[in-house]
Amino acid sequence: MAGQQPEVGAQSGVEPQAEAGPEVAAGLKAEADGLAVLGSQTGVVDELKLGGQSEVGGVAEAGGSLERQADSPPLRPADALVIAGLVPMSTVDWPGNLVATIFTQGCPWNCFYCHNHALIPTRLPGTVPWAAVRELLGRRHGLLDGVVFTGGEALRQDCLADAAREVVEAGFRVGLHSAGCYPRRLADLAASGLLSWVGLDIKALPEHYPAVVGRPNSGQKAWDSLEVLLASQGVGGPDFEVRTTVVPDDVTAADAVEVARRCRELGVGAFALQQARSQGARSGFTAVAPGWDAQCERMAAQIEALGFERFEFRPA
């Protein structure tokens, strides 16, 4: 999964959202009260808020999930997007931007530390229709900078480009959290001109990926996705940051500094080191250990010394 950090994402426990001004907060309260909302930091499910009986943009809500009335067929290609959650306003999913964050259902990888493991299954139906996103954006001009697609892994859905195009046509920029599972699809989307920014998770060195994500050949795909983004920089491709999430006593921690060093040598300008968190993860997973915080601070200092244009340490 991709939600900043992880992946419902990538890439992202409850992360406090920065307070908005009164005019923004008042305008968004109605959406937050009636919608299925998944909070995130880089892709981690922070909380689920389900309203009672309400109606959002003509879409009926019953029992806490939003469904099209009378099983009406999709009216546009983007209506096929399977959405597990929507945050009407986020300050943490795209650095320096105020965005709406869309959590897509399904991820082909199975990271053991995933904070959004409920979004890994690929056959679950969505709970938020694209019509609700469309209606939200119609009222948020001047209040939001853009929309971030996270997951799960948003690139696994064929209609992602259609949804991104609608966002751009509505006057907003598009951000993406990805674990790099689909380098060819990422290349196509980067070349389309629809993407403004990508948060790419590089979880480990290529040879150690199967131990992290539970899938063979996964490391090659993720590092190929990094090459895709680097190659796009000279031809109008999206800005991007690489994020590595670390777990105590694990290969992710052992690899982190070397991952950062290789990224810097390849020309990556923005890098983030993220501590995994126990909140929202599978039962039995723990992201704490004696001396772990101090170890992460030492890793952060080593990575910062590599000279990235922008480096951020994101503690748990």
For each predicted feature, which ranges?
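Auxiliary Fe-S-binding modules of radical SAM enzymes
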Residues: 1-7, 13, 29, 33-35, ...
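N-terminal intrinsically disordered, low-complexity tails
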Residues: 16-21, 25-28, 35-38
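Canonical Radical SAM [4Fe-4S] cluster-binding loop centered on the CxxxCxxC motif
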Residues: 75, 92-128
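A secondary-structure boundary/capping signal
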Residues: 103, 150-151
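Conserved alpha-helical substructure of the radical SAM core
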Residues: 117-147
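Short, flexible loop segments at the rims of nucleotide/cofactor-binding pockets, characterized by
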Residues: 123-126, 152-153, 175-176
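Conserved AdoMet/S-adenosylmethionine-binding subsite of the radical SAM
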Residues: 134-146, 155-287
